[in-house]
Structures are given as C-alpha cells and as structure tokens.
C-alpha cells in the first residue's frame, strides 16, 4: 500500500490543453509576452546609448514596461475564465504591435514611457494567457520545462541579434523587432482552446494500489503566498537584469564581452530546463526550488563583494541557469494547485509588479552613490525572502495536502 506521499495527483477528465497544438500555441504566444523582460539588459543599454537618459530615467522606462506587464496580467486573471482566450491573446498582440511602433516615434521621456507601458500591457495579456493555458495541462513540470527551454533558445538568439540590430538602427530597430515578432503569432492562436471547462481547483489523489482516495482542496492562502514569493524573487530579477550590463561597464568591462556572456548564459540555462523536469519526477518541485534559491542568494552576495570579469561571468551563468530553473518550479507549484489558470495568470502580475519597482529602487540606490554592490545586496535579500516563504509553503503542504507537496 502506497503512502499518500507516494500517490499521484491528477485532475479528472479529458484535457484539451495537453494536446500538442494547444501547447505549441501557448508557448509561441509566450514569445510576445516575455521578449522585453528577457531582453531588458540590452534594451536598457541601447536606450542609454541612443537616447542618453540617466540611470534613474532608465529605471523609470524599464518600470513602465514592467508596470504594463503587471496590469495586463491582472486583467487576464479576471477575464481568463470569462472571455475566449484567443481574443485575449489577439488583443495583447495588437497592443504589442501598435505600442512598439509608437515607441519609434518620439525620443522624449514621457511619450516613450507611455508607449512602453502600453507595450507592457500587451505583453502581460499574452504572457498571462500563455501561463494560464499551460497551467491547464496535467504535467506541469514537463510542460513548463518545454516552455522555458524554447524561450531560452529564443532569447539566446535575441542576445545574439540585438547588438547587430542596435549597431545598425539603434533602439528603434529593437522596437521594430518586437513589432515584427508579434505579427505571425496571430496566425497560431486558433490552435489554443477557447475556454477551460473545469471551474474548481479540485484534485484527486490516485492510490496506485486501490485507485482514487480523496479530494483535496488547497487553502487559498498558500497560492497567494507563492505569488508573494514570485514577487520577491522578481525584485532580484528586475534589479539584476536591468543593471547587470551597466554594472560591468562601470568597472571597465567591454559591452562585447558582456553581450557574449549574456548570450552564452542563456545557452547554458537550456540545461536547467531539462534538469528541472528530471528533478521534478525524482524529488517533486519544492525541494529543488528551495535549493536553487539558496544558490541564488549566494550568487548575489558574491557579486555584492566584488564586480570583475570573473565574478560577473560567474553571476550571469549562475543567474541565467537558476532563473529558468526556479521559474519551472514556481509555475509548476501553482499549476498543481489550480488548473483553471486563475493563479497562474497572476504570475506575470507578480513578476511585472516586481520588475516595475525593482529597477526604480535600484536606480535610487545608484542615485545616492551607493554603487552596484548595494544593488546586488538588494537582490540577495529578495531571494532570501522568497526562500523563507517557499520553506513555509512546503511545510504547510506536507501537513495539509502531502500528495501535492512532492508531486511533479
């Protein structure tokens, strides 16, 4: 007889979101939702070079994109069970297209902040619809590993091509890239299921010896705590990702070297998605997540002490690998709790709100002449808070619903 920890947790019924076409449509839609966030270091650097804004103003611009991402995600979480998901994705794509075109029309700070905010809203709609649809699958770790593997490959290409585009056309070339990327995705949307039929977050434990055991309901405070942890972790992401390129330049490291490390860091992180899927089947999702956050705290502390070519390269490789690794498990935990996508749709909101405020906070630290070491200390503290929250959540799941606590 299996113990409840050894039971499998499954949803009931046939799942249209597990079909290959539905997964492909959601993943491709995710390109438009995550492109700016993943390419933020080079985009910020290009804006600085082309438009000559201060560090604080660059933080405001980065926050505009991420603030829009937050709003788009919140809107999606309210609408995802009420409105055709294809319509949500299409509206988001049209916003991305129009707002990126508008970004090419004015070099002034306020108009550019407004257009970047609108682009962020569109990206948030796309990203949240993507995550909500993938959350409807019955194999969360595997599905999100595939999703993030494809995104990392795409973003490695972005890090390769952006310096070339920037060198020829400046920051406007990058805005046009995002515009052109969104157009063909419109034709993939019909593959996505329109609605999720199951309206509850009920799951059932399947005992391998005796069949169905019991229905489990996860208390709502646990997924909300998970979203808080996502927010805290993305304070790290927003501050580090917005200023890591600037931090290297400040100590005399060439932009070509930094761009190369960023590209290879993305390639290296591909192995993290495969490892995450394997570890999830072997150890569940919470234990690898907690370990990865411990490593991330240490990485940020190393960079807080000293920034040079060696520590910068180490931090970029470590950050790139564990960022993707952590995201697989954060999304997977929420998907196990709620297949309707309501909480998963709020993940981009948590990410976007954190990335909206993090560059501004980091910019303020720099404006007070505290240096990039202070920014890295902020990153370490944010990762530590997320670590503490997930330790608590894992403990509560072991007590309340152990079948989910160590589920893959």
PLM feature spans:
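Extracytoplasmic gate region of multi-pass secondary transporters
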Residues: 41, 221-263, 267
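Intracellular juxtamembrane helix-capping segments at the cytosolic ends
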Residues: 125-138, 324-338
């Amino acid at each position: 007889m299996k113990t409840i920890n050894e039971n499998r947790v499954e949803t009931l019924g046939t799942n249209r979101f597990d079909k290959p076409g539905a997964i492909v449509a959601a993943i491709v839609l995710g390109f438009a939702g995550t492109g700016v966030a993943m390419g933020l270091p080079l985009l910020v650097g290009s804006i600085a070079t082309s438009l000559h804004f201060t560090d604080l103003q660059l933080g405001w611009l980065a926050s505009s994109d991420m603030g829009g991402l937050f709003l788009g995600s919140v809107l999606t979480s309210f609408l995802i069970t009420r409105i055709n998901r294809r319509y949500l994705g299409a509206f988001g794509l049209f916003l991305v297209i129009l707002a990126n075109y508008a970004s090419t029309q004015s070099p002034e700070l306020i108009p550019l902040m407004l257009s970047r905010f609108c682009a962020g809203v569109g990206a948030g709609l796309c990203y949240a619809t993507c995550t909500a649809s993938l959350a409807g699958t019955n194999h969360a770790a595997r599905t999100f590993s595939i999703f993030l593997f494809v995104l990392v490959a795409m973003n490695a290409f972005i890090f390769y091509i952006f310096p070339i585009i920037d060198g020829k056309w400046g920051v406007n070339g990058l805005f046009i890239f995002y515009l052109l990327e969104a157009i063909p995705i419109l034709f993939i949307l019909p593959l996505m299921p329109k609605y999720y039929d199951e309206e509850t977050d009920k799951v059932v434990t399947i005992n391998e010896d005796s069949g169905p055991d019991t229905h489990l309901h996860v208390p709502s405070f646990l997924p909300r705590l998970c979203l808080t942890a996502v927010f805290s972790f993305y304070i790290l992401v927003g501050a580090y990702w917005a200023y890591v390129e600037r931090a290297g330049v400040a100590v005399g490291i060439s932009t070509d070297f930094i761009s190369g490390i960023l590209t290879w860091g993305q390639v290296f992180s591909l192995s993290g998605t495969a490892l995450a899927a394997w570890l999830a089947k072997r150890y569940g999702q919470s234990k690898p997540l907690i370990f990865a956050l411990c490593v991330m705290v240490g990485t940020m502390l190393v960079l807080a002490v000293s920034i040079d070519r060696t520590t910068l390269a180490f931090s970029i490789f470590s950050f790139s690998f564990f960022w993707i690794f952590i995201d697989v498990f954060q999304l997977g935990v929420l998907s196990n709790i709620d297949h309707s996508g309501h909480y998963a749709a709020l993940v981009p909101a948590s990410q976007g709100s954190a990335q909206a405020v993090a560059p501004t906070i980091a910019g303020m630290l720099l404006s007070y002449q505290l240096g990039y070491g202070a920014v890295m200390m902020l990153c370490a503290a944010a990762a530590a808070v997320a670590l503490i929250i997930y330790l608590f959540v894992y403990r509560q799941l072991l007590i309340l619903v152990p079948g989910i606590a160590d589920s893959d």
